[in-house]
A protein has these predicted regions:
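A short beta-strand motif characteristic of beta-propeller blades
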Residues: 84-92, 127-132, 167-172, 213-220, ...
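Structural motif
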Residues: 59-76, 117-121, 156-161, 196-207, ...
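Blade-level signature of beta-propeller repeat domains, shared across WD40, Kelch, NHL, RCC1
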Residues: 357, 364-365, 374-398
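Recurrent small/Gly-Pro-centered beta-turn motifs in extracellular repeat architectures
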Residues: 47-57, 112-116, 150-154, 190-194, ...
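Bacterial N-terminal signal peptides that target proteins for export
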Residues: 1-7
Length: 398
């Protein structure tokens, strides 16, 4: 059940002047021209930098319904420690998407992906760095020097491709990945499943890829369904349902543990998150009245469940703590900070899947106005206003 303690540290409202008017005066030299500002020099190398990406729309435009999506004059603005860093024009003519899940900050650079219908275009800081002849939804990107690794699902059917600078390393025309491309033990890893037809029966086989080398995951014969699978500290860990076992089970570090579960709840999904010392995970459940809710696990025996209707957003692990947000439901929104709960400011919500980060030990969460006002940055209970007309799409530590 949802905890009763509410920590209301919402004082010290500060205003960050982002200089949007100055940023907006970018000369229209060519479509890939961008504006750069004082945020390019943020940080001195001794502390982490907080990068915020926002979509900034013309004054008076209803960005919540976005009736002219893809054609309205819009900018993807990046802030570094509260200072405007760059502004990239958004729209079909610029091949920069207004979707919040089609950009990310990596090593202080803005990477965007865009689909033309026949090609995928990737840009770095507003400049095209590669394009390849496939229409893909990217679910992961890793950058090593000048090399860009991507994991993408086909927009026109089943299958996926793992690429290096647009060139195919691994391609499958059926199956799916588990939605993450990440480092583990110094290797770039991901997991996927592929259907195998055997004697008129379709069987799911599960695989792991590390630096392009594929190995089949060794699972028990009584596995009915694998909910999630990940490489952690060089070994394969997974959550599965077994024949004859009521509760889902975690297999990790050579051990099998049944999960403590919310009562009268049917699992819909699990997502594992690696911590410094052990794994954490988040689950989504359906109750008998068809309402849904999230739960968080600190270990197989330690489950934090929430009231029906409370669904986790922007969930991540920093150090060995879980951080996430729950957008407003019947009892209002909730911010979860490594075991502590805070009331989300009324009238605000999280608009993207990656709107939270711990920067220099402080939880930063991007909150956007449900009424169309300016967004705010929540910093361990304090609020900072960003004077833009739009919403926060991501918050990243760098």
């Amino acid at each position: 059940m949802r905890k009763n303690r509410w920590m209301m540290g919402l004082a010290a409202l500060a205003v960050i002047s982002c200089g949007v008017e100055e940023v907006g005066r970018r000369p229209e030299v060519n479509r890939e021209d961008i504006w750069t500002g004082p945020g390019m020099n943020a940080g001195n190398g001794s502390r982490e930098i907080c990068y915020i990406t926002c979509f900034d729309y013309p004054e008076g435009y209803d960005w919540r319904t976005d009736p002219q999506k893809g054609s309205v004059k819009c900018s993807l603005t990046v802030f570094a420690d509260g200072l405007p860093m760059m502004k990239v024009p958004v729209g079909d003519e610029y091949q920069v998407s207004p979707d919040p899940d089609m950009h990310r900050m990596i090593d202080g650079h803005l990477y965007t992906d865009y689909c033309t219908g026949s090609e995928t275009v990737i840009k770095k800081d507003g400049k095209t760095v590669l394009r390849y002849p496939a229409s893909e939804v990217l679910c992961g990107m890793v950058v090593k020097g000048d090399t860009i690794y991507t994991l993408g699902h086909s927009r026109h059917g089943d299958g996926f491709a793992y690429r290096r600078n647009g060139e195919i390393i691994i391609e499958r025309f059926s199956g799916r990945t588990f939605g993450r491309l990440h480092y583990d033990d110094g290797r770039i890893c991901f997991a996927f499943t592929e259907p195998i037809i055997s004697e008129n029966e379709t069987i799911e086989r599960y695989y792991h890829c590390a630096d392009g080398d594929i190995s089949q995951a060794a699972l028990r014969d009584d596995v009915k369904k694998v909910w999630d699978i990940i490489s952690y500290k060089g070994d394969i860990s997974y959550i599965a349902s077994l024949t004859g076992v009521e509760k889902p089970v975690l297999f990790s570090d050579g051990r099998m543990c049944a999960l403590v579960m919310p009562q009268n709840a049917e699992p819909l999904s699990f997502s594992m998150m690696p911590g410094e010392e052990h794994l954490f995970w988040e689950g989504l459940f359906k109750y008998q009245d068809h309402t849904v809710a999230s739960a968080l696990w600190l270990s197989p025996e330690r489950c934090v469940s929430f009231e029906e209707g409370m669904v986790a957003n922007s969930c991540f692990v920093s150090g060995d703590g879980i951080y996430c947000a729950f957008n407003p439901a019947a009892l209002g929104g909730l911010i979860y900070r490594a075991g502590e709960e805070f009331a989300m400011p009324a009238g605000y919500a999280v608009m993207g899947a990656g709107c939270g980060a711990v920067v220099n030990g402080i939880f930063h969460l991007g909150l956007s106005s449900l009424e169309g006002g300016c967004p705010k940055l929540w910093k361990d209970g304090k609020l900072e206003l960003l004077e833009i007309h739009g919403y926060i799409a991501s918050v990243t530590a760098g």
